[in-house]
């Protein structure tokens, strides 16, 4: 059986890690042990924050909706309750976008929610 020298495979593996560690600072970009650890940790952060991103955006939409309905004499929770009672099915992302880009349309939805609460 022929002897297998593993230099080519090792070099390819290291190259892959270095490519992922591109842009890192200090030894984390050019020492294989540090680069591997940094790339692993970066992967953990990426996985965790893909989940967290959904929560963060929902919180942002809620804050924007709340800021838009307060001048209309309502709070966020009262507004959402009014929407549910009036049968308006619009998600928070769309409501937030409407509040920013189409204030008149958002105000019409808010009036509908207010009317449903009064009834």
Curated annotation (Swiss-Prot):
Family to which this protein belongs: Belongs to the bacterial ribosomal protein bL20 family.
Q: Which GO terms describe its cellular component?
A: ribonucleoprotein complex; ribosome
- Cross-referenced Pfam families: Ribosomal_L20
- UniProt GO MF annotations: rRNA binding; structural constituent of ribosome
Instruction: Give the keywords, sorted.
Output: Ribonucleoprotein, Ribosomal protein, RNA-binding, rRNA-binding
Gene name for this UniProt entry:
rplT
State what protein this is by name: Large ribosomal subunit protein bL20
Q: Which InterPro entries has this protein been placed in?
A: Ribosomal_bL20, RIBOSOMAL_L20_CS, Ribosomal_protein_bL20_C
Record-level GO BP terms: ribosomal large subunit assembly; translation
What is its biological role? Answer: Binds directly to 23S ribosomal RNA and is necessary for the in vitro assembly process of the 50S ribosomal subunit. It is not involved in the protein synthesizing functions of that subunit.
* Organism (species): Rhodopseudomonas palustris (strain BisB5)
Query: RNA-binding: is it a keyword of this entry?
Result: yes
């Amino acid at each position: 059986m022929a002897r297998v020298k593993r230099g080519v495979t090792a070099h390819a593996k290291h190259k892959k890690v270095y490519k992922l560690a591109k842009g890192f600072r200090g030894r984390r970009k050019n020492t294989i042990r540090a680069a591997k650890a940094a790339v692993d940790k970066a992967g953990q952060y990426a996985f965790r924050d893909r989940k967290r991103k959904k929560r963060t955006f929902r919180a942002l939409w809620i804050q924007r909706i709340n800021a838009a309905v307060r001048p209309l004499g309502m709070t966020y929770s009262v507004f959402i309750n009014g929407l549910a009672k009036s049968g308006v099915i619009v998600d928070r992302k769309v409501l937030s976008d409407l509040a920013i880009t189409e204030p008149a349309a958002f105000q019409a939805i808010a009036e509908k929610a207010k009317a449903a609460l009064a009834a």
